[in-house]
Regions:
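Short microdomains enriched in Cys/His and/or Lys/Arg
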Residues: 125-161
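Structural signal for well-ordered, non-membrane alpha-helices
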Residues: 20, 156, 160-167, 194-197, ...
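Secondary-structure edge/capping motif, primarily at the C-terminal ends of alpha-helices
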Residues: 19-26, 163-166, 170, 295
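Short, contiguous alpha-helical
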Residues: 2, 6, 31, 60-103, ...
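General detector of N-terminal leader/presequence modules that precede the first folded domain
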Residues: 1-45, 160
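A short, mixed-charge helix-start or loop-turn motif at secondary-structure junctions
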Residues: 141-145, 223-230, 266-270
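Short, cysteine/histidine-rich loop/knuckle motifs that typically chelate Zn2+
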Residues: 107-110, 119-126
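Acidic/histidine-rich alpha-helical segments that form the ligand environment
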Residues: 47-88, 105-108, 155-156, 160-162, ...
Length: 299
């Protein structure tokens, strides 16, 4: 797909325009097709660009794009937030919610606001409640409580099937293109679950807990305080999962909407935290599947 053509760009804009017009006319089933096509085009182009670029200075790219947004007069506030995010990353820390507030975009005209929308759209007059909130990722609202519990129960079964029959050597072998081994992925799942376990305890014992940011992905290759084998890491993960499921199933449904203050993401509910971790795990299953295929081919 050649995205460097006027036709590609014009088609993308036309799809968004068509979707907006169809929504105004109440033809939502057709509008969803136009929006899906636009999203597919954008994601496909980004997927190709990431692979073509290879190693890239992410901090510098953020700064470059912030400058481009200023030139296009998109949003000075957003450009400034991107610069603050780049500065935090350059210092080796996670940007806070104060530095990178949640963005809201008017669904009618595209006007962008950082932080809660308290007034009508400055461009088209749309009501505050009609703005689209851009969450840090889709995991927050992916699963409602019963679906999240079902997924938390299912994922260890899928992981067990993926690692079945593999030796410790195979599970400790790095990916051919570099990156994590199966051992690292399972360690990451175990570590992330540990964060969920701890935060669930905070929600159970405190009215409005403060949730510290955790760079969990940086722990996956550390070997200190790890069980000696990948299978033992998995068994530890599976045992803790059973305990978490028991506690979640005992919670009154209303308690899922209790909120805490996350240092990175701001106000979050227990429902969003459980959805986050349950959906996050799914993104690693294809990674384990690919590593399994690599191990089987190497036999």
């Amino acid at each position: 797909m050649d995205t460097q053509t006027p036709e590609w760009t014009a088609t993308l804009v036309r799809l968004f325009a068509l979707a907006s017009r169809l929504e105004e006319e109440g033809h939502y089933n057709v509008a969803k097709l136009a929006r899906a096509a636009a999203d597919s085009m954008g994601r496909g182009a980004a997927y190709a660009a990431v692979r073509a670029a290879g190693e890239q200075d992410t901090v510098q790219e953020i700064r470059n794009l912030a400058g481009s947004l200023r030139q296009l007069d998109v949003s000075e506030g957003l450009a400034a937030a991107l610069q603050r995010g780049a500065t935090a990353l350059a210092k080796g820390r996670i940007p806070s919610i104060g530095e990178t507030p949640h963005p809201y975009v008017c669904r009618t005209c595209g006007h962008l606001v950082l932080g809660p929308v308290d007034d009508h759209c400055a461009t088209c007059g749309a009501w505050p409640g009609t703005f689209q909130w851009f969450a840090p990722n889709w995991w927050f609202d992916a699963l409602e409580p019963f679906a999240a519990i079902a997924q938390l129960r299912q994922t260890p079964l899928e992981v067990a099937a993926l690692i079945s029959g593999l030796s410790e050597q195979a599970m400790a072998h790095d990916a051919q293109e570099g990156g994590w081994a199966i051992r690292n992925v399972l360690t990451h799942l175990r570590d992330a679950q540990g964060v969920l376990d701890f935060r669930l305890g905070l929600f159970e014992s405190e009215e409005h807990p403060v949730l510290a940011s955790k760079a969990v992905w940086t722990w996956a290759t550390r070997e200190e305080e790890r069980p000696p084998t990948t299978q033992e890491i998995f068994e530890d993960y599976r045992t803790t999962r059973r305990d978490i499921l028991t506690r979640l199933e005992a919670l009154p449904l209303a308690n899922w909407w209790r909120t805490g203050l996350h240092e990175e993401f701001g106000e979050v509910s227990l429902r969003q935290q459980v959805s986050y971790f349950a959906a996050h795990e799914l993104t690693h299953l294809s990674q384990v599947a690919g590593l399994r295929e690599q191990a089987v081919r190497s036999r």
